[in-house]
Structures are given as structure tokens and as C-alpha cells.
Amino acid sequence: MLPLVALVGRPNVGKSTLFNALTLTRDALVHDQPGVTRDRHYGVCRIDGQPLFAVVDTGGMVGKEDGLAGATARQARLAAAEADVVLFVVNVREGVSALDDDILAWLRKLSQPTLLVINKIDGVSDATVHSEFAHYGFSDVVPVSAAHRQGLDDLIEQVLAWLPERGIGEALDEDSERIHIAFVGRPNVGKSTLVNRLLGEERMIVSDVPGTTRDSITVDLERDECRYRLVDTAGLRRKSKVEEAVEKFSAFKTLQVIEQCQVAVLLLDAGEGVTDQDATVLAAILDAGKALVVAMNKWDGLGTYQREQAEDLLSRKLGFVNWAEVVRLSAKHGSGLRELFRAIHRAHVSALRQFSTSEVNKALEIAYQTAPPPSIRGHVSKLRYVHPAGSNPPTFIVHGTRLKVLPDTYKRYLENFFRKRFKLVGTPVRFLFREGDNPYEGRKNVLSERQIQRRRRLMRHVKRK
């Protein structure tokens, strides 16, 4: 495994900025509002593409043991306990605080190798930087400015000196065989509860407060000899409901996760049915063209009549994505999880399937003969040939003439025909239509000089007669 380095400290000392600087990403949310980071957030520090160590960002510790603050502190303690080296991050501009003293006392009891990282040194004199925290007695002190990437090389060098020798781990590797799954949905439908159930630990903070998860958290899982990468995302609300700037950033990162995943699991609250917020999330998945599994959570809490109502509402509101499998489950009690993974696998296989040009042309020929395109204002579209253009989602390019008048109903017919013929489940199917180009369009027949002379001779001969 890759060795693990944990970033701990009080709120707003720059831990997430340092995380982004070390991992060369923007995976952790950064904002001047304290308390933005709540869960553990993992990344990898690399040099020239080679992974050196894993980094875990934690929420700011405020000394409270109740509510979300307490849950955030527990996540930070778990991260520090599993780390090989702890980076205790402080803010030189604000100086020493009582909260820093409390965190240091806890770290000394933990007995983990710890480096003091003095952040935000830009514009501060060297004398102030070295004297402000001198009484802490650290032998290893690294001044940095995470925002300006100042001092990072020294920090990485000191971290490597403390780390044990290990190989590349699978917790945060770039294994291409892993199925990347994004759990998405509106706030408080049970995404974090479901991921915790799958992992068998309290990896995500779970609360009845909507919007508890603000960042997208990535963890790896092995189940039934298969590898997965799970991403728990912040709940997407309608834009009019997204008020805090931080929540807007979270929503944006959720959209990024949808773009990067292979299979999106849309989690619905079975007791509340399909809401406008659910439709917003679904629209983002469809726009990205991702494989889709619909999961009805909290199914065990419904009676027979309520289940019938939920099924009816689902078929009416989500009938246009009837190609997506629907799984009924309970994240809290763990029922339906095997069916969920089976649906994910079927969607993943369908989304990444490769097609030959001959088989898709045969399918187009049968579809065309079974139901030719209708005549639109006296014009009939002609479909000449098709070829595959990509996967995830399966994409096909159809060439022909008068394709601009091809109605949307016929395009949907082709999608459904291909989906049924090739047994594609859980994935959208895209068709692109290209008009056949006339190779002589815009070209003028220009005679050569020899042809012009010959034409003149012929014309003179005709005139004599």
C-alpha cells in the first residue's frame, strides 16, 4: 500500500489548500468559511507521475464532541490513527490559539510521527515564522505557503524521510479495471448511509441534516472478486435552493463526478417519490450520457399500498428512462445490495460494449425494412449505412440523405431497436446523423486550353455547314 499522510488542524488553517497543492488537484473544496471540509478526503502526491504517498484531508477540529462538529472531529482522529505521518497544520498569521494547544496535546498522546507545518508564511518575516510556534518543541518544522506552492518541495522531502518503504497501494491506485460508481441524488436520501453499508464502516458522516456531505468522497471497495471505486457526492438541489457559495461549489463538483464516473446510481427516497430535485439530478446524468441504475431507498419502510403508489409514480415520471433498471433497497438494513451490484454490472458491460461495423449495419438494415422512415412534406429520409463511434455510452453515426427531416420519433425507434437487438440495459444509446455530401457540390467544370481549341474548331465546322 501507499504510505498515508494525514493533514490535521483547526478550521481554516489551509489544510484543503495544502491537500490540493500536494495532489496537484482541486479535489478538496477551499473556502474562507471555516468548516467546509467535514469527511476524510483522499488523494495521491506524485512527482513526474510517480505516486509517492497518499494524503488524507480532514475537517477542522473545534473541540466539540456533539453534532456535526463532533462527527468531523471523529473523522479527523480516525484519519490520524491510520496515518503513517501526521502533518499538524497551523496558521502563522493568526498565531497560536488554545485550540492549537488542545490538538497538539491529543497528537502527543497519539504517538504518531508528526511534522509541524506552518502555513500562510507569504508576507510574514522569517523571524516571526520561526518564533511563533517555537515553544511547541518540534524538531521538524516546515514553513509553507500552500496557496503559492512555496516550501512544498522541502515538505515532501521531509515527509519522505519519515515514511516507511512501501509499494503502490490499491486503496488509491489508478486501476483501470475498477468500476467507477457515483452515488448521486438530492440531499438526505441516504447516499452516505448506503456507502457506509457497502464498506461496513462509518466512513461518511451521516446526519438527518440535509446537505451534510458537501464534498465528493472517493473510496475503493472489493466485493465478490470485483473492484469498485465508490464516490459519495453532495446532494444536488434546484439552483434556486442553492444559497451558500460553498454549496454551489459542492454541486459543481458533483456534476464533475458524474462526468467522470462509469455508472451513476440515482438514489431516490421511496417514501417521497420522484421530485423535481430528482429530475434535476437525472438530467445531469442523461446530459453526461452515463450508465444509470435507479435505486429506491427506504423501501422496507413502506406498506403494500405505499409501494404500489411509489411504483406508479416511478413509471409515470421516469417512463422515458425505462431502459434503466430499478432496484428496491434499504441502505440502513442492507437489503437489496446484491441486486444493486448486479444491475451496476449489467449497465457497465452494456455501456462499454464494442460493436463491429457489420453487425450494426445488419441491425440498421433490419430496422429500416421493419419500419421505414415516414414521409415528411413529401420527403423521405434514406439511411445508407452506420458505423460505431464510441462507448460509454454506445454511440453510432448514421449516414444518409434528407436526414434533417427525420422525425425524433424515428430516432427513438432506432435507439430502442438497437437496445433490444443488442440487449443493452442501463445505458443510453446515442445516434448521430450525417448527410451524404455531394463530392461535386460547388465545383465548376473548367475546360483545358486544348479542349477549348478543339471546341472552337468544331464550332467553325458546324457554322460552315
UniProtKB/Swiss-Prot annotation:
- Binding positions for GTP 1? 9-16, 57-61, 119-122
Keyword Transmembrane helix (UniProt):
no
Which residue numbers delimit the EngA-type G domain? 3-167, 179-352
Q: Where does the record place the KH-like domain?
A: 353-437
GO molecular function, one example?
Answer: GTP binding
This protein's superkingdom? Bacteria
Please cite one Gene Ontology biological process associated with this protein: ribosome biogenesis
Could you list this entry's UniProt keywords, alphabetically sorted. GTP-binding, Nucleotide-binding, Repeat, Ribosome biogenesis
One family name in Pfam for this protein: KH_dom-like
Which residues does GTP 2 bind? Answer: 185-192, 232-236, 297-300
> What InterPro entries has UniProt attached to this entry?
AAA+_ATPase (IPR003593), G_ENGA (IPR031166), GTP-bd (IPR006073), GTPase_Der (IPR016484), KH_dom-like (IPR032859), KH_dom-like_a/b (IPR015946), P-loop_NTPase (IPR027417), Small_GTP-bd (IPR005225)
- Key word Membrane present: no
| Assembly and binders | Associates with the 50S ribosomal subunit.
Which family is it part of?
A: Belongs to the TRAFAC class TrmE-Era-EngA-EngB-Septin-like GTPase superfamily. EngA (Der) GTPase family.
Q: What does this protein do?
A: GTPase that plays an essential role in the late steps of ribosome biogenesis.
Name listed for the protein in its UniProt record = GTPase Der
Organism annotation: Xylella fastidiosa (strain 9a5c)
